[in-house]
Every structure is written in C-alpha cells, then in structure tokens.
C-alpha cells in the first residue's frame, strides 16, 4: 500500500494570538518548530519510503516540512511548493482576533464565516495591510480576496489530481505539509466526507495523519501518529 502523510504546520505566531491567518505569512513559534521536529521523528519510525513532498508557498508550511525532513534525515527529498496548497483565504477577517471578532459581530455570524462549507467571509479590501497583490510569490496569480472551504477545495483538487495523485498511483510514498483547511479539503475528497460534516473535522498542528491508499487511491487505513494529540478520524469510505 502507498502511504500519504498529511502534516498541518506547527503552531504559528497567529495561532498563538488567536488571529485569523489565512494567506498572511505568519511564521512558526518555538512550539511550532518543536511540533514540526516531533512530526519528523514520528515519520522516521513509520515503515515507509517517502520520496516526494509538497507544501504551500507559506513559510509556516515550508519550515514545517524542512524541520520534519531534518529529523528524518531526508533533507534531500524533492519538495514542490505551490500556492494551490495555501490556507483558505479569510478575506476581511485576516489579522483579526477571533474572540474580538465574535464579540463585535456575534458568535453565530463568525461561526458561519468560519465553519460553513460554502459561505465565505467578507472580502479583503484592496490596499489593505494584508493585501498580497505585490508579493513576488504570487506574481501572475489572480489572488482571491476571500474563500469558503468549498472554493478552497476547488483550487486544491485540480492540483491534487494533476501533481500529487499520479505519484501515489505509481507507488510513491508522499508527504504534504500544508494547512488546516487545505488539508481538510483533501480529507473531504479522499474520504467522501459530506459537506455538512467536513467543517467540523479538526486537524491538529504538528501531528502527522498517515493514510494508506490502495492502487485506486482509496484509503484502507488512517491514523494520527501521535495518539495522545489525536483528534477524531474520518470514516473509511
């Protein structure tokens, strides 16, 4: 069976501050770095031969991958970085404290923005402090100004099908270091999770989700490598 390891980046500075991060390039905290290294130590003990890796173009995911690979003694592994694996864009919520936003707009409204499948937050204003239109990593890209989980899946899925799935079908054990929502989108696709329940699936930081896939990329087993920090798992399809 081919193995796929999904790693949500370690704790970021804005995770710690309870802020909506999205596409903003918040870096890892010291705890996040430790989580990334711990992920690598856990993956080093897995009976797998990881030969390919993918990340977003966001620093917290890239550094999580590199710190994990360092512990695995696999820094030579070819890694492809692509914006299609970026976190969901939180639009006008970017940079806001989640608790303060709930106090201002009401918990019910913020819950809709955060947890509905197809309702995005208000768009980010052009020229905002968090406008990334001049960031060189996004040159030539039509950057979204907000996203729902559905539109996040709409950009993640073609990349999965074109770039990641072919290697897995060929039997290449693969690692992906990305973000809560881009990984949630992949889990939805792989496990056929319904729209109404996928938003409730929590993926912890720095705890690899190891999935074994058959030749048709159907999951046959799934587990978190750190059982003490594990969250609920999707049902096998």
From Swiss-Prot:
Q: Does the keyword Isomerase apply?
A: yes
Q: Which residue positions does UniProt flag as site: Transition state stabilizer? A: 179
Primary enzyme class: isomerase
Note the SS bond partners.
none
Describe which pathway this protein belongs to, using the record's wording. Answer: Carbohydrate degradation; glycolysis; pyruvate from D-glyceraldehyde 3-phosphate: step 3/5
Query: Assembly and interactions?
Result: Homodimer.
- This chain belongs to the protein called 2,3-bisphosphoglycerate-dependent phosphoglycerate mutase
């Amino acid at each position: 069976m081919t193995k796929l390891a999904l790693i949500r980046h370690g704790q970021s500075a804005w995770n710690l501050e309870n802020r909506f991060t999205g596409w903003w390039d918040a870096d890892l905290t010291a705890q996040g770095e430790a989580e990334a290294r711990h992920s690598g130590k856990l993956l080093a003990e897995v009976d797998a031969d990881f030969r390919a890796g993918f990340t977003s173009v966001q620093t917290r995911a890239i550094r999580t991958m590199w710190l994990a690979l360092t512990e695995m003694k696999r820094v030579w592994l070819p890694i492809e970085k692509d914006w299609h694996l970026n976190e969901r864009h939180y639009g006008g919520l970017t940079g806001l404290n989640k608790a303060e936003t709930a106090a201002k707009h009401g918990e019910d409204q913020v819950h809709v923005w955060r947890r509905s499948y197809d309702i995005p937050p208000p768009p980010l204003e052009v020229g905002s402090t968090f406008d990334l239109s001049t960031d060189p990593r996004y040159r030539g890209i039509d950057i979204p100004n907000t996203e729902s989980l559905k539109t996040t899946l709409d950009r993640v899925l073609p990349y999965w099908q074109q770039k990641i799935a072919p290697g897995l079908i060929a039997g290449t054990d693969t690692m992906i270091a990305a973000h809560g929502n881009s990984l949630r989108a992949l889990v939805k696709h792989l496990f056929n999770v319904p729209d109404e329940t996928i938003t409730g699936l929590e993926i912890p930081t720095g705890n690899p989700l190891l999935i074994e896939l058959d030749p048709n990329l159907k999951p046959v087993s799934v587990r978190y490598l750190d059982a003490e920090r594990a969250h609920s798992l999707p049902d096998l399809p």
